[in-house]
Amino acid sequence: MKTSMFLTLTGLVLLFVDCYASESEEKEFPKELLSSIFAADSDFKVEERGCLGDKCDYNNGCCSGYVCSRTWKWCVLAGPWRR
């Protein structure tokens, strides 16, 4: 029930945006609006997320909390199960 209401409301909002853009003189308005709505904010990015899966060797260390995998040669999470 909640999902169907959310999808219906989302559909109505998108229909409104589409109708407004078709009446608008600017043809790029929907793209600008949607890109501003879904733009990723750099403040929410965590530095350590970028380290997971990065290529490494023992000379080039990983971020804190990650270690260089001996087998795969990329940064993995450090934990008690790791050697």
Swiss-Prot record:
Record GO terms (molecular function): carbohydrate binding; ion channel inhibitor activity; toxin activity
UniProt signal peptide: 1-21
Disulfide bonds: C51-C63, C56-C68, C62-C75
Gene Ontology CC annotation, any one: extracellular region
Annotated family: Belongs to the neurotoxin 10 (Hwtx-1) family. 51 (Hntx-8) subfamily. Hntx-8 sub-subfamily.
Description of its domains: The presence of a 'disulfide through disulfide knot' structurally defines this protein as a knottin.
Stated name of the protein: U5-theraphotoxin-Hs1a 4
Species per Swiss-Prot/TrEMBL record: Cyriopagopus schmidti
